[in-house]
Amino acid sequence: MIDYTAAGFTLLQGAHLYAPEDRGICDVLVANGKIIAVASNIPSDIVPNCTVVDLSGQILCPGFIDQHVHLIGGGGEAGPTTRTPEVALSRLTEAGVTSVVGLLGTDSISRHPESLLAKTRALNEEGISAWMLTGAYHVPSRTITGSVEKDVAIIDRVIGVKCAISDHRSAAPDVYHLANMAAESRVGGLLGGKPGVTVFHMGDSKKALQPIYDLLENCDVPISKLLPTHVNRNVPLFEQALEFARKGGTIDITSSIDEPVAPAEGIARAVQAGIPLARVTLSSDGNGSQPFFDDEGNLTHIGVAGFETLLETVQVLVKDYDFSISDALRPLTSSVAGFLNLTGKGEILPGNDADLLVMTPELRIEQVYARGKLMVKDGKACVKGTFETA
């Protein structure tokens, strides 16, 4: 028999639901961190002691899934003082991020996969959903167990591996190292019931995606398990990325890169090229270092990349590129969940996790629920991380 009091039911009434598909005006019933029901009219007395939230005139959509975040900090390329700090929970939730994938960057000397794993687990305890990629720019990969395959297979939060290619900061890996790494991630994923993906940080080298094509020629890892990211950082790379997506690959556009290919422009161009939105994702590269230069190219100061560009990209897609709200949301919701095989994420459906955003008609975030818990109210975090000030 259900203990309705313990279940803590919440009924979200009257919002325009984008699940992300347009469902019109709907009610959503939530309990125990899950979506229990979605219908055009759910009576408020369907269960006793139900908290009713009137969302008339507002939009309800899935929480954002940001698959590229430097959870324990990034940077360091301009010396020790440019190492960015760990991310705070509220920076994620106030940007609408309810699920996150952490990773390392250039620095795998003073930062370690073990520390990233601890941070990932901490964020799960603080209320959102978090996973990680093992490895970093360096190849062979820095790992926890000594093996990419073991990390992915047996460590609960590890779902794949990351490396860098076509970048002066990479380890200049040859095709056989890349193929072995991707194959280990793939097999580890099979053994552990994980996606087993390989994420490639893309640099500005004119080689662009050629190392990935060489990998595909020399091993049998499916193209669907390989993800080039930062593909909008230069025009030739972006053009190659579109061709990669036409061949069946998925591409990741970085929201914090505003030129030469702005994120909304990149998504729009992909759609114009006939690429399904299911194979286009958007991520922030958040919490990494963000350098600023003067007119002579001198470094003036370094900030920390934020997450606001995710929502801004959605807004620009709707306002400037005539995207439906449904399609504008997909690269941050269902497309990411599909690529990473994140069961229960990315769609508002019965049985899925209650990761929900409440937005105004102008697409401003008002409330954020993560696994059914209210994390943001009136646009401000009402739940803070362990060491955040109230």
Swiss-Prot record:
<feature type="binding site">
    <location>
        <position position="169"/>
    </location>
    <ligand>
        <name>substrate</name>
    </ligand>
</feature>
<keyword id="KW-0170">Cobalt</keyword>
<feature type="binding site">
    <location>
        <begin position="75"/>
        <end position="77"/>
    </location>
    <ligand>
        <name>substrate</name>
    </ligand>
</feature>
<keyword id="KW-0645">Protease</keyword>
<feature type="binding site">
    <location>
        <position position="201"/>
    </location>
    <ligand>
        <name>Zn(2+) 2</name>
    </ligand>
</feature>
<feature type="binding site">
    <location>
        <position position="233"/>
    </location>
    <ligand>
        <name>substrate</name>
    </ligand>
</feature>
<protein>
    <recommendedName>
        <fullName>Isoaspartyl dipeptidase</fullName>
        <ecNumber>3.4.19.-</ecNumber>
    </recommendedName>
</protein>
<feature type="binding site" description="via carbamate group">
    <location>
        <position position="162"/>
    </location>
    <ligand>
        <name>Zn(2+) 2</name>
    </ligand>
</feature>
<feature type="binding site">
    <location>
        <position position="70"/>
    </location>
    <ligand>
        <name>Zn(2+) 1</name>
    </ligand>
</feature>
<dbReference type="InterPro" id="IPR033826">
    <property type="entry name" value="Isoaspartyl-dipeptidase"/>
</dbReference>
<feature type="active site" description="Proton acceptor">
    <location>
        <position position="285"/>
    </location>
</feature>
<dbReference type="Pfam" id="PF01979">
    <property type="entry name" value="Amidohydro_1"/>
</dbReference>
<keyword id="KW-0862">Zinc</keyword>
<dbReference type="GO" id="GO:0005737">
    <property type="term" value="C:cytoplasm"/>
</dbReference>
<feature type="binding site">
    <location>
        <position position="289"/>
    </location>
    <ligand>
        <name>substrate</name>
    </ligand>
</feature>
<comment type="similarity">
    <text>Belongs to the peptidase M38 family.</text>
</comment>
<dbReference type="GO" id="GO:0016810">
    <property type="term" value="F:hydrolase activity, acting on carbon-nitrogen (but not peptide) bonds"/>
</dbReference>
<keyword id="KW-0378">Hydrolase</keyword>
<dbReference type="GO" id="GO:0008237">
    <property type="term" value="F:metallopeptidase activity"/>
</dbReference>
<dbReference type="InterPro" id="IPR010229">
    <property type="entry name" value="Pept_M38_dipep"/>
</dbReference>
<dbReference type="GO" id="GO:0008270">
    <property type="term" value="F:zinc ion binding"/>
</dbReference>
<dbReference type="InterPro" id="IPR006680">
    <property type="entry name" value="Amidohydro-rel"/>
</dbReference>
<keyword id="KW-0479">Metal-binding</keyword>
<dbReference type="InterPro" id="IPR011059">
    <property type="entry name" value="Metal-dep_hydrolase_composite"/>
</dbReference>
<feature type="binding site" description="via carbamate group">
    <location>
        <position position="162"/>
    </location>
    <ligand>
        <name>Zn(2+) 1</name>
    </ligand>
</feature>
<feature type="binding site">
    <location>
        <position position="68"/>
    </location>
    <ligand>
        <name>Zn(2+) 1</name>
    </ligand>
</feature>
<keyword id="KW-0482">Metalloprotease</keyword>
<dbReference type="InterPro" id="IPR050378">
    <property type="entry name" value="Metallo-dep_Hydrolases_sf"/>
</dbReference>
<feature type="modified residue" description="N6-carboxylysine">
    <location>
        <position position="162"/>
    </location>
</feature>
<dbReference type="GO" id="GO:0042802">
    <property type="term" value="F:identical protein binding"/>
</dbReference>
<feature type="binding site">
    <location>
        <position position="106"/>
    </location>
    <ligand>
        <name>substrate</name>
    </ligand>
</feature>
<feature type="binding site">
    <location>
        <position position="230"/>
    </location>
    <ligand>
        <name>Zn(2+) 2</name>
    </ligand>
</feature>
<dbReference type="GO" id="GO:0005829">
    <property type="term" value="C:cytosol"/>
</dbReference>
<dbReference type="GO" id="GO:0008798">
    <property type="term" value="F:beta-aspartyl-peptidase activity"/>
</dbReference>
<dbReference type="GO" id="GO:0006508">
    <property type="term" value="P:proteolysis"/>
</dbReference>
<feature type="binding site">
    <location>
        <position position="137"/>
    </location>
    <ligand>
        <name>substrate</name>
    </ligand>
</feature>
<dbReference type="InterPro" id="IPR032466">
    <property type="entry name" value="Metal_Hydrolase"/>
</dbReference>
<comment type="function">
    <text>Catalyzes the hydrolytic cleavage of a subset of L-isoaspartyl (L-beta-aspartyl) dipeptides. Used to degrade proteins damaged by L-isoaspartyl residues formation. The best substrate for the enzyme reported thus far is iso-Asp-Leu.</text>
</comment>
<keyword id="KW-0963">Cytoplasm</keyword>
<feature type="binding site">
    <location>
        <position position="285"/>
    </location>
    <ligand>
        <name>Zn(2+) 1</name>
    </ligand>
</feature>
